Protein backbone atom coordinates (compact mmCIF):
# COMPACT_ATOMS: atom_id res chain seq x y z
CA UNK A 1 0.00 0.00 0.00
CA UNK A 2 1.17 3.52 -0.78
CA UNK A 3 -1.07 5.04 1.92
CA UNK A 4 -2.64 3.46 4.99
CA UNK A 5 -4.63 5.46 7.51
CA UNK A 6 -5.50 3.40 10.57
CA UNK A 7 -8.10 4.36 13.17
CA UNK A 8 -7.57 8.08 12.67
CA UNK A 9 -9.15 10.52 15.11
CA UNK A 10 -8.66 14.26 14.86
CA UNK A 11 -9.99 16.50 17.62
CA UNK A 12 -9.03 20.17 17.66
CA UNK A 13 -8.32 22.16 20.81
CA UNK A 14 -11.77 23.76 20.66
CA UNK A 15 -13.29 20.28 20.89
CA UNK A 16 -14.31 19.99 17.23
CA UNK A 17 -14.17 16.34 16.16
CA UNK A 18 -12.94 16.65 12.56
CA UNK A 19 -12.25 12.97 11.80
CA UNK A 20 -13.79 9.94 13.45
CA UNK A 21 -12.43 6.41 13.13
CA UNK A 22 -11.06 6.88 9.63
CA UNK A 23 -9.48 3.86 7.94
CA UNK A 24 -8.30 4.25 4.37
CA UNK A 25 -5.94 2.48 1.96
CA UNK A 26 -4.50 3.57 -1.37
CA UNK A 27 -2.83 1.09 -3.72
CA UNK A 28 -0.06 1.89 -6.17
CA UNK A 29 -1.42 3.46 -9.34
CA UNK A 30 -4.87 4.22 -7.95
CA UNK A 31 -6.50 7.64 -8.26
CA UNK A 32 -8.74 8.13 -5.24
CA UNK A 33 -11.35 10.86 -5.23
CA UNK A 34 -12.37 11.98 -1.75
CA UNK A 35 -15.67 13.80 -2.03
CA UNK A 36 -17.98 15.45 0.45
CA UNK A 37 -19.65 18.70 1.34
CA UNK A 38 -17.84 21.69 2.86
CA UNK A 39 -16.78 21.02 6.44
CA UNK A 40 -16.96 17.24 6.04
CA UNK A 41 -13.26 16.78 6.90
CA UNK A 42 -11.77 16.34 3.43
CA UNK A 43 -8.92 18.85 3.72
CA UNK A 44 -8.07 17.70 7.24
CA UNK A 45 -7.81 14.16 5.90
CA UNK A 46 -5.39 15.01 3.10
CA UNK A 47 -3.22 17.19 5.33
CA UNK A 48 -2.79 14.24 7.68
CA UNK A 49 -1.30 12.11 4.91
CA UNK A 50 1.88 14.21 4.75
CA UNK A 51 1.68 15.30 8.39
CA UNK A 52 0.92 18.94 7.73
CA UNK A 53 -1.48 18.11 10.53
CA UNK A 54 -1.09 15.33 13.06
CA UNK A 55 -3.96 13.12 14.21
CA UNK A 56 -5.10 12.97 17.82
CA UNK A 57 -4.70 9.19 17.55
CA UNK A 58 -4.11 6.54 14.91
CA UNK A 59 -1.39 5.69 12.39
CA UNK A 60 -0.34 7.35 9.14
CA UNK A 61 1.68 5.03 6.91
CA UNK A 62 3.09 6.23 3.58
CA UNK A 63 5.20 3.83 1.54
CA UNK A 64 5.13 1.47 4.52
CA UNK A 65 6.56 3.99 7.00
CA UNK A 66 4.60 5.46 9.93
CA UNK A 67 5.26 9.17 9.46
CA UNK A 68 4.22 9.91 13.04
CA UNK A 69 7.31 8.10 14.34
CA UNK A 70 9.82 10.04 12.23
CA UNK A 71 12.17 12.73 13.46
CA UNK A 72 11.94 16.13 11.69
CA UNK A 73 14.77 15.45 9.21
CA UNK A 74 13.42 11.97 8.47
CA UNK A 75 9.95 13.40 7.89
CA UNK A 76 11.35 16.05 5.56
CA UNK A 77 13.02 13.32 3.50
CA UNK A 78 9.87 11.19 3.44
CA UNK A 79 7.85 14.17 2.21
CA UNK A 80 10.04 14.39 -0.89
CA UNK A 81 8.13 11.36 -2.16
CA UNK A 82 4.82 13.13 -1.57
CA UNK A 83 3.86 15.93 -3.96
CA UNK A 84 1.02 18.31 -3.15
CA UNK A 85 -0.99 20.89 -5.06
CA UNK A 86 -3.52 23.32 -3.61
CA UNK A 87 -6.64 25.22 -4.62
CA UNK A 88 -4.87 28.61 -4.70
CA UNK A 89 -1.58 27.39 -6.21
CA UNK A 90 0.73 28.70 -3.40
CA UNK A 91 3.28 30.14 -5.82
CA UNK A 92 5.90 32.66 -4.72
CA UNK A 93 4.91 35.96 -6.34
CA UNK A 94 8.46 37.37 -6.29
CA UNK A 95 9.87 34.39 -8.21
CA UNK A 96 9.33 33.58 -11.87
CA UNK A 97 8.11 30.23 -13.18
CA UNK A 98 11.60 28.73 -13.37
CA UNK A 99 12.47 29.88 -9.86
CA UNK A 100 9.20 28.59 -8.38
CA UNK A 101 9.88 25.09 -9.65
CA UNK A 102 13.59 25.25 -8.84
CA UNK A 103 12.77 26.24 -5.26
CA UNK A 104 11.53 22.72 -4.47
CA UNK A 105 14.80 21.28 -5.79
CA UNK A 106 16.92 23.75 -3.84
CA UNK A 107 15.18 22.79 -0.59
CA UNK A 108 15.90 19.13 -1.40
CA UNK A 109 19.57 20.08 -1.94
CA UNK A 110 19.82 19.11 -5.58
CA UNK A 111 23.11 19.91 -7.27
CA UNK A 112 22.92 23.26 -9.06
CA UNK A 113 24.16 21.68 -12.28
CA UNK A 114 21.14 19.34 -12.32
CA UNK A 115 18.47 21.83 -11.29
CA UNK A 116 18.32 23.68 -14.63
CA UNK A 117 17.78 20.57 -16.74
CA UNK A 118 15.24 19.16 -14.28
CA UNK A 119 13.19 22.38 -14.25
CA UNK A 120 13.09 22.55 -18.05
CA UNK A 121 12.08 18.88 -18.16
CA UNK A 122 9.19 19.56 -15.77
CA UNK A 123 8.01 22.69 -17.57
CA UNK A 124 7.97 20.82 -20.86
CA UNK A 125 5.93 18.09 -19.17
CA UNK A 126 3.21 20.57 -18.11
CA UNK A 127 3.31 22.57 -21.35
CA UNK A 128 4.92 25.75 -20.00
CA UNK A 129 8.35 25.65 -21.61
CA UNK A 130 7.61 29.06 -23.17
CA UNK A 131 6.73 30.66 -19.81
CA UNK A 132 10.07 30.17 -18.04
CA UNK A 133 10.61 33.86 -17.22
CA UNK A 134 6.99 34.78 -16.52
CA UNK A 135 5.86 35.74 -13.01
CA UNK A 136 2.67 34.39 -11.38
CA UNK A 137 0.77 37.65 -11.94
CA UNK A 138 1.32 37.21 -15.69
CA UNK A 139 -0.24 33.74 -15.75
CA UNK A 140 -3.81 32.49 -15.98
CA UNK A 141 -5.28 30.30 -13.25
CA UNK A 142 -4.70 27.17 -15.29
CA UNK A 143 -1.09 28.12 -15.99
CA UNK A 144 -0.47 28.79 -12.30
CA UNK A 145 -1.79 25.33 -11.46
CA UNK A 146 0.50 23.82 -14.10
CA UNK A 147 3.47 25.49 -12.40
CA UNK A 148 2.27 24.06 -9.09
CA UNK A 149 2.01 20.60 -10.64
CA UNK A 150 5.54 20.88 -12.04
CA UNK A 151 6.82 21.93 -8.63
CA UNK A 152 5.00 19.05 -6.91
CA UNK A 153 6.72 16.56 -9.23
CA UNK A 154 10.20 18.04 -8.82
CA UNK A 155 11.53 15.35 -6.47
CA UNK A 156 10.04 12.40 -8.36
CA UNK A 157 7.28 11.53 -5.86
CA UNK A 158 5.22 8.36 -6.10
CA UNK A 159 2.24 9.99 -4.36
CA UNK A 160 0.44 13.19 -5.35
CA UNK A 161 -2.02 14.94 -3.03
CA UNK A 162 -4.48 17.37 -4.62
CA UNK A 163 -6.53 19.59 -2.29
CA UNK A 164 -9.42 21.11 -4.29
CA UNK A 165 -6.92 21.65 -7.11
CA UNK A 166 -9.56 22.56 -9.71
CA UNK A 167 -12.24 24.34 -7.67
CA UNK A 168 -10.83 27.80 -8.52
CA UNK A 169 -10.83 27.04 -12.26
CA UNK A 170 -13.49 27.23 -14.96
CA UNK A 171 -14.82 24.02 -16.50
CA UNK A 172 -12.64 24.14 -19.64
CA UNK A 173 -9.46 24.73 -17.63
CA UNK A 174 -10.50 22.06 -15.13
CA UNK A 175 -10.77 19.56 -17.97
CA UNK A 176 -7.29 20.46 -19.25
CA UNK A 177 -5.77 20.07 -15.77
CA UNK A 178 -7.47 16.71 -15.23
CA UNK A 179 -6.25 15.53 -18.65
CA UNK A 180 -2.73 16.60 -17.69
CA UNK A 181 -2.90 14.79 -14.34
CA UNK A 182 -4.25 11.65 -15.98
CA UNK A 183 -1.37 11.61 -18.45
CA UNK A 184 1.20 12.23 -15.71
CA UNK A 185 -0.29 9.43 -13.60
CA UNK A 186 0.00 6.97 -16.46
CA UNK A 187 3.53 8.06 -17.38
CA UNK A 188 4.95 7.78 -13.86
CA UNK A 189 2.53 5.24 -12.33
CA UNK A 190 1.67 7.73 -9.59
CA UNK A 191 -0.88 7.22 -6.86
CA UNK A 192 -3.15 10.24 -6.44
CA UNK A 193 -5.49 11.41 -3.69
CA UNK A 194 -7.81 14.12 -5.02
CA UNK A 195 -9.95 16.07 -2.56
CA UNK A 196 -12.96 17.65 -4.24
CA UNK A 197 -16.60 18.65 -3.89
CA UNK A 198 -17.02 18.40 -7.68
CA UNK A 199 -18.51 15.08 -8.77
CA UNK A 200 -17.38 15.78 -12.36
CA UNK A 201 -13.76 15.56 -11.20
CA UNK A 202 -14.33 12.09 -9.77
CA UNK A 203 -16.05 10.96 -12.97
CA UNK A 204 -13.31 12.25 -15.26
CA UNK A 205 -10.16 11.38 -13.31
CA UNK A 206 -10.62 8.76 -10.59
CA UNK A 207 -10.93 4.98 -10.53
CA UNK A 208 -11.57 4.82 -6.75
CA UNK A 209 -13.65 7.07 -4.52
CA UNK A 210 -14.73 7.56 -0.95
CA UNK A 211 -17.46 9.76 0.47
CA UNK A 212 -16.85 11.63 3.71
CA UNK A 213 -19.55 13.18 5.87
CA UNK A 214 -19.20 14.77 9.33
CA UNK A 215 -15.69 13.38 9.69
CA UNK A 216 -16.57 9.79 8.79
CA UNK A 217 -16.04 7.78 5.61
CA UNK A 218 -19.57 6.66 4.80
CA UNK A 219 -18.87 4.89 1.50
CA UNK A 220 -15.76 3.53 -0.23
CA UNK A 221 -15.22 1.58 -3.44
CA UNK A 222 -14.53 1.82 -7.15
CA UNK A 223 -16.11 4.75 -8.97
CA UNK A 224 -17.99 2.31 -11.15
CA UNK A 225 -19.42 0.39 -8.16
CA UNK A 226 -20.55 3.48 -6.28
CA UNK A 227 -22.10 5.18 -9.30
CA UNK A 228 -23.94 1.97 -10.16
CA UNK A 229 -25.18 1.25 -6.64
CA UNK A 230 -24.77 4.11 -4.14
CA UNK A 231 -25.90 3.11 -0.67
CA UNK A 232 -25.53 6.09 1.67
CA UNK A 233 -27.93 9.04 1.54
CA UNK A 234 -25.06 11.56 1.27
CA UNK A 235 -23.60 9.64 -1.67
CA UNK A 236 -26.94 9.72 -3.46
CA UNK A 237 -27.21 13.46 -2.88
CA UNK A 238 -23.71 14.07 -4.25
CA UNK A 239 -24.49 11.96 -7.31
CA UNK A 240 -27.69 13.92 -7.84
CA UNK A 241 -29.94 10.91 -7.30
CA UNK A 242 -33.30 11.99 -5.92
CA UNK A 243 -36.62 10.25 -5.64
CA UNK A 244 -38.29 13.03 -7.59
CA UNK A 245 -40.93 10.61 -8.85
CA UNK A 246 -42.40 9.85 -5.42
CA UNK A 247 -45.54 11.82 -6.24
CA UNK A 248 -46.33 9.67 -9.27
CA UNK A 249 -49.62 7.77 -8.97
CA UNK A 250 -48.23 4.42 -10.08
CA UNK A 251 -46.32 2.43 -7.50
CA UNK A 252 -44.31 0.47 -10.06
CA UNK A 253 -41.55 3.00 -10.73
CA UNK A 254 -37.99 1.68 -10.94
CA UNK A 255 -34.48 2.95 -11.51
CA UNK A 256 -32.47 0.64 -13.78
CA UNK A 257 -28.69 0.89 -14.04
CA UNK A 258 -27.00 -0.28 -17.25
CA UNK A 259 -23.26 -0.96 -17.17
CA UNK A 260 -21.12 -0.50 -20.26
CA UNK A 261 -21.73 -3.87 -21.92
CA UNK A 262 -25.52 -3.42 -21.78
CA UNK A 263 -25.74 0.17 -23.01
CA UNK A 264 -26.15 -0.75 -26.68
CA UNK A 265 -28.58 -3.63 -26.11
CA UNK A 266 -32.35 -3.19 -26.75
CA UNK A 267 -33.23 -4.36 -23.26
CA UNK A 268 -36.45 -2.39 -22.87
CA UNK A 269 -37.70 -3.57 -26.27
CA UNK A 270 -36.88 -7.16 -25.32
CA UNK A 271 -38.69 -6.69 -22.03
CA UNK A 272 -41.89 -5.57 -23.75
CA UNK A 273 -41.75 -8.45 -26.26
CA UNK A 274 -41.05 -11.12 -23.62
CA UNK A 275 -43.62 -10.10 -21.02
CA UNK A 276 -47.17 -8.80 -20.99
CA UNK A 277 -46.25 -5.35 -19.74
CA UNK A 278 -45.89 -1.82 -21.04
CA UNK A 279 -42.87 0.29 -20.11
CA UNK A 280 -43.05 4.06 -19.82
CA UNK A 281 -39.65 5.80 -19.75
CA UNK A 282 -39.77 8.73 -17.32
CA UNK A 283 -36.13 9.87 -17.52
CA UNK A 284 -32.66 8.67 -18.44
CA UNK A 285 -29.02 9.66 -18.72
CA UNK A 286 -25.51 8.28 -19.25
CA UNK A 287 -22.49 8.93 -17.01
CA UNK A 288 -19.08 8.71 -18.71
CA UNK A 289 -16.56 7.35 -16.19
CA UNK A 290 -12.85 6.61 -16.58
CA UNK A 291 -13.44 2.83 -16.54
CA UNK A 292 -16.74 2.44 -18.38
CA UNK A 293 -19.98 4.25 -19.09
CA UNK A 294 -23.05 3.75 -16.92
CA UNK A 295 -26.61 4.39 -18.07
CA UNK A 296 -29.67 5.10 -15.94
CA UNK A 297 -33.36 4.81 -16.76
CA UNK A 298 -36.32 5.64 -14.55
CA UNK A 299 -39.31 3.66 -15.83
CA UNK A 300 -42.89 2.83 -14.94
CA UNK A 301 -44.06 -0.75 -15.45
CA UNK A 302 -47.72 -1.25 -16.38
CA UNK A 303 -49.10 -4.77 -16.09
CA UNK A 304 -50.07 -7.52 -13.68
CA UNK A 305 -48.07 -8.08 -10.51
CA UNK A 306 -46.96 -11.50 -11.77
CA UNK A 307 -45.72 -10.18 -15.14
CA UNK A 308 -43.90 -7.25 -13.54
CA UNK A 309 -42.20 -9.66 -11.14
CA UNK A 310 -41.10 -11.86 -14.05
CA UNK A 311 -39.72 -8.79 -15.83
CA UNK A 312 -37.75 -7.78 -12.73
CA UNK A 313 -36.30 -11.29 -12.43
CA UNK A 314 -35.26 -11.09 -16.08
CA UNK A 315 -33.45 -7.78 -15.49
CA UNK A 316 -31.72 -9.16 -12.40
CA UNK A 317 -30.63 -12.25 -14.35
CA UNK A 318 -28.92 -9.93 -16.85
CA UNK A 319 -26.92 -8.45 -13.97
CA UNK A 320 -28.63 -5.07 -14.01
CA UNK A 321 -29.14 -2.99 -10.88
CA UNK A 322 -32.86 -2.40 -10.30
CA UNK A 323 -34.17 -0.18 -7.50
CA UNK A 324 -37.82 0.45 -6.71
CA UNK A 325 -38.35 4.17 -6.23
CA UNK A 326 -41.82 3.98 -4.70
CA UNK A 327 -43.41 1.33 -2.51
Curated annotation (Swiss-Prot):
CDD domains: ABC_MetN_methionine_transporter (cd03258). Residues 3-239 form the ABC transporter domain. It is found in: Cell inner membrane. Transmembrane segments: none annotated. It catalyses: L-methionine(out) + ATP + H2O = L-methionine(in) + ADP + phosphate + H(+); D-methionine(out) + ATP + H2O = D-methionine(in) + ADP + phosphate + H(+). Its main location: membrane. GO terms for molecular function: ABC-type D-methionine transporter activity; ATP binding; ATP hydrolysis activity. Its EC number is 7.4.2.11. It holds the Pfam family ABC_tran. ATP binds at residues 36-43. It is a peripheral membrane protein. Keywords: Amino-acid transport, ATP-binding, Cell inner membrane, Cell membrane, Membrane, Nucleotide-binding, Translocase, Transport. GO terms for cellular component: plasma membrane. PROSITE patterns: ABC_TRANSPORTER_1, ABC_TRANSPORTER_2, METN. Belongs to the ABC transporter superfamily. Methionine importer (TC 3.A.1.24) family. The complex is composed of two ATP-binding proteins (MetN), two transmembrane proteins (MetI) and a solute-binding protein (MetQ). Part of the ABC transporter complex MetNIQ involved in methionine import. Responsible for energy coupling to the transport system. This is Methionine import ATP-binding protein MetN. The lineage of its organism: Bacteria, Pseudomonadati, Campylobacterota, Epsilonproteobacteria, Campylobacterales. The gene is metN.
Amino acid sequence: MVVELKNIEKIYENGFHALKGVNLELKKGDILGVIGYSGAGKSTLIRLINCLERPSSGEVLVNGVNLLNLKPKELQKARQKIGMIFQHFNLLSAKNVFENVAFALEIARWEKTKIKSRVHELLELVGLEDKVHFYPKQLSGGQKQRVAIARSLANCPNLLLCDEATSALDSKTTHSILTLLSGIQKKFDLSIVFITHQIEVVKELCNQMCVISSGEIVERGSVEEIFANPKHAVTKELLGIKNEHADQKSQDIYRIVFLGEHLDEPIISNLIRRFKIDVSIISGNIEELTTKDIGYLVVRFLGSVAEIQRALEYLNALGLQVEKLKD
